[in-house]
């Protein structure tokens, strides 16, 4: 029965692991719902700023903010939003693949790369992969604050205003639904015009202190809000991916327990059969 004892020990060990993964799945579900609420709450703010920027830009065509001016790209910047923890399937791996692919396209065109990394997984990746990381921040927690991001974002915006980079993009995972998280690379500056930016009303507004100063402030706030939106959405995607990964681990543990239980029963049956055969053989000899 030595084999049966070993199998019984394995079953107990897997059951213990199954309890842990099941608990982690439930925790991820709770955190995902909270992250979804933060994600939904942050969207209207960024959308409204975008609308006001569009109105200001169209109403004051004589002033072009630097964030709205296209220029030849010699150096590009990326703000990379990754997670601080693992056990979330291929979430970070898929994100890094999409980023590296985009970086390679730029490098083939002679464009150099600067990186701002959010999340410890991104920092670890670029320590191994290599890359010019000019700013980094990690351990933002489950409820990130936009104030925690301002310093790192400012480093990249100052680089753009000083002409050290000519384009800035944010790389993060989009939360499509519980089962789908899509890695995306979105251009932040120069600001890309969108169809919904067209004015539906041509009303005149009075701006205080003036339209130029207001636009200057709003452009920075808009970029900060977009990065914050990327962080909270990536957090929701992380929790969804972790929930799915832990569910799969729990299900796989259940399948493995069933297989081992069957092997254990067969081993036990074989041992009993062997003992009966020995008893019968001994009785026949007598």
From Swiss-Prot:
Keyword set includes Membrane: yes
MF terms in GO: ATP binding; proton-transporting ATP synthase activity, rotational mechanism
SUPFAM superfamilies: ATP synthase (F1-ATPase), gamma subunit
Location of this chain's protein in the cell: Cell inner membrane
UniProt feature coiled coil, ranges: none
GO biological process, one term: proton motive force-driven plasma membrane ATP synthesis
InterPro entries referenced in this protein's UniProt entry, alphabetically: ATP_synth_F1_ATPase_gsu (IPR035968), ATP_synth_F1_gsu (IPR000131), ATP_synth_F1_gsu_CS (IPR023632)
Topology within the bilayer: Peripheral membrane protein
Keywords: ATP synthesis, Cell inner membrane, Cell membrane, CF(1), Hydrogen ion transport, Ion transport, Membrane, Transport
UniProt KW S-adenosyl-L-methionine keyword: no
One term under GO cellular component: plasma membrane
Record-linked Pfam families: ATP-synt
Main location: membrane
Recorded family membership: Belongs to the ATPase gamma chain family.
Subunit structure: F-type ATPases have 2 components, CF(1) - the catalytic core - and CF(0) - the membrane proton channel. CF(1) has five subunits: alpha(3), beta(3), gamma(1), delta(1), epsilon(1). CF(0) has three main subunits: a, b and c.
Job description of the protein: Produces ATP from ADP in the presence of a proton gradient across the membrane. The gamma chain is believed to be important in regulating ATPase activity and the flow of protons through the CF(0) complex.
Protein name per its UniProtKB record: ATP synthase gamma chain
Gene source species: Pseudomonas putida (strain W619)
Name of the encoding gene: atpG
């Amino acid at each position: 029965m030595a084999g049966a004892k070993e199998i019984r020990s394995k079953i107990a060990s897997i059951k213990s692991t199954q309890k842990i993964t099941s608990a982690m799945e439930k925790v991820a579900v709770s955190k995902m719902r909270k992250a979804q609420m933060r994600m939904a709450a942050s969207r209207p703010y960024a959308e409204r700023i975008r609308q006001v920027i569009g109105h200001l830009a169209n109403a004051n065509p004589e002033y072009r903010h630097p964030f709205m001016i296209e220029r030849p790209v010699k150096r590009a910047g990326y703000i990379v939003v990754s997670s601080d923890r693992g056990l979330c399937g291929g979430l970070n791996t898929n994100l890094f693949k999409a980023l590296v692919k985009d970086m390679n396209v730029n490098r083939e065109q002679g464009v150099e790369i600067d990186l701002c990394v959010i999340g410890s997984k991104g920092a670890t990746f670029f320590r191994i992969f290599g890359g010019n990381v000019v700013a980094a921040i990690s351990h933002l927690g489950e409820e990130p604050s936009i104030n925690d991001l301002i310093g790192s974002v400012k480093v990249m915006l100052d680089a753009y205003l000083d002409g050290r980079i000519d384009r800035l993009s944010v790389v993060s995972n989009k939360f499509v639904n519980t089962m789908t998280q899509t890695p995306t690379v979105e251009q932040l500056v120069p600001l890309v015009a969108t169809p919904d930016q067209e004015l539906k009303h041509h009303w005149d507004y009075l701006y205080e202190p003036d339209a130029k100063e207001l636009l200057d402030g709003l452009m920075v706030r808009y970029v900060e809000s977009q990065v914050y939106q990327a962080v909270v959405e990536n957090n929701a995607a992380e929790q969804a991916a972790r929930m799915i990964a832990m569910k799969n681990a729990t299900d796989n543990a259940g399948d493995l327990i069933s297989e081992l239980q069957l092997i254990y029963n067969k081993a036990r049956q074989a041992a009993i059969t062997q003992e009966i055969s020995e008893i019968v053989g001994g009785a026949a000899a007598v």
